[in-house]
Amino acid sequence: PEATEKKIVRSALETDDAWFNSGDLMRTVDVGFTLGYPHYQFVDRVGDTFRWKSENVSTNEVGEIINGFGQIKFCNVYGVEIPGTDGRAGMAAVTLQDGVAELDVDAFSTFLRSELPAYAVPLFVRIQPDIDVTGTFKMVKGDLRKQAYDIRSFDDTVYALLPGSDRYAAFDLAMLEKIEAREAGF
């Protein structure tokens, strides 16, 4: 009973409402023929974790925080390897809300650093036009993990939170080469 109660969010949107946090990530979609009733689509099952700086990081918890930033439509959080470090650093692939042309990097940096512990703030953010999903609408993480922050393998914009900085900066080939040479200071 106590564990179940922890999964129930009360008064989330209205007084006395209740929501059971099942661990499934859903989204509302317009399928065009529901006669005004909402249609929900399964997006992902939450619960993935990775270790960074000797801490366990929940991709679900980080993703929920990122989704709380007004410019973000969807995000997919995963861990990526950095040569010469233990564990995996956080990386988030995000899509921007309709009508948002460019991520406000300063506001996003401030938001994440105020909402997450330092070890959980993703070191890399990849801006994608769409989030890839499987036939069962599960977010695809495998290819993203393999590509990581190697901007030679895709055309998306990447921002990095560099060591000693409190703000994301545009990621370029010079920084990629420093990481590969283990000279970036992570």
Spell out what each predicted region is:
Residues 147-159:
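A short, polar/charged loop-to-alpha-helix boundary motif
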Residues 3-120, 130, 135-139, 143:
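AMP-binding/adenylate-forming catalytic core of the ANL superfamily
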Residues 185-186:
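Long, low-complexity intrinsically disordered regulatory regions
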Residues 116-139, 156-181:
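AMP-binding/adenylate-forming catalytic domain of the ANL superfamily
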